[in-house]
Every structure is written in C-alpha cells, then in structure tokens.
Amino acid sequence: MKKIKPKDGNKTFCMAPWVHTFISPQMERRMCCASREPSMNFKQYIDSSKPANDELKLLPLKEHWNSDHMKSVRKRLMAGEEIPECATCNHKLLNAQVYRQHFNRFYRDGIDEAFEKTNDEGETSMQVASWDYRFSNLCSFSCRMCGPPLSSSWETENKKQGKFEPWMQNCLLYTSDAADE
C-alpha cells in the first residue's frame, strides 16, 4: 500500500478517520460532521440525494471503526487520494477553515502513529479520541451552512415557507416542539 505522510506532500490526509467519530441527530454515524458518506438511514444536512431507505439502522462504533468503508477511506487518504467523502474540505465548500486543517493541527503528534498503526488493508489499532455526538437539532441559530436536520430554527422556517420535505419528518427524531408551531 502506498503511504505518503503530510510532511512528504500528502495534501489530502486527515486525522479524522483515526481519531474521530460523529453521530448526527438522525443517528447516522460518519467520519465527521462535514463528510459526505453514503447515508445508511436518512438524508443528512449536507447530502443532496434522497435517503437510501426508510429503515433505521444504528451502526455501533465497534462495527464502524474498522468497517470496509473506513478501511478504504484510510487507505485512500494515506495514498494522497482526493476522496469524494471529503468534498467539503477538498473544495472548501463551507468557505472557512476546513475541518481537515483542524484535525491535522490538533492531532499532529499522532500522524506518525496513524501511519504506524494502520495495516495495508486500512485497519487501525488506534482508538477514538474525539466524539461529536449530536442528539438533537435544537438550536436557536440559523447559520447559512446548516439546515433543518441540525437546526430547529431552520426546520421551523422551512415549515413556515412550505419547504419542508415530507420524508424529513421521519428523520428528525429529536426535534423541538417549537418547530411544529
């Protein structure tokens, strides 16, 4: 397996798949809040496609951490590939400091360890050090980069304007009562 460290010119490497896990209010597990991974359950705030199905499938961390998907992501990132899951950072879609920079700066002392503790199949023995678990979309802000699944304010506004997609009713598991007013 080809391995290129950031200090050797790898511009796409990100520490998130080695140290971080994210769960959305819709209980989708992903690499981080900005990753564009195939949805197991529902459309996410950053997705542009319909949900894969209507059945809720919760993915435990143990199954996710060294899943085929995560191993593939790690291998591709270590090889310096620009992967579609990381389009938000690759193309700076949020017009801000990209999450990749945050993870690589904050966990810079673990980069060599990530390369050492990842085998040729992409499996790692590193443990999660950062959890971003969002159990609700309750939020009084309406940030432009957000949307109804992560902001009850956006949810309320969309309902008022008749822009609330019917399928989203099933995926907003923990919405506020105010959103229904």
Where are these predicted regions, by residue range?
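Accessory C-terminal segments flanking Radical SAM cores
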Residues: 2-119, 124-132, 153
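Canonical Radical SAM [4Fe-4S] cluster-binding loop centered on the CxxxCxxC motif
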Residues: 31-38, 133-173
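Conserved small/polar residues in nucleotide/adenosyl-binding loops
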Residues: 174-179
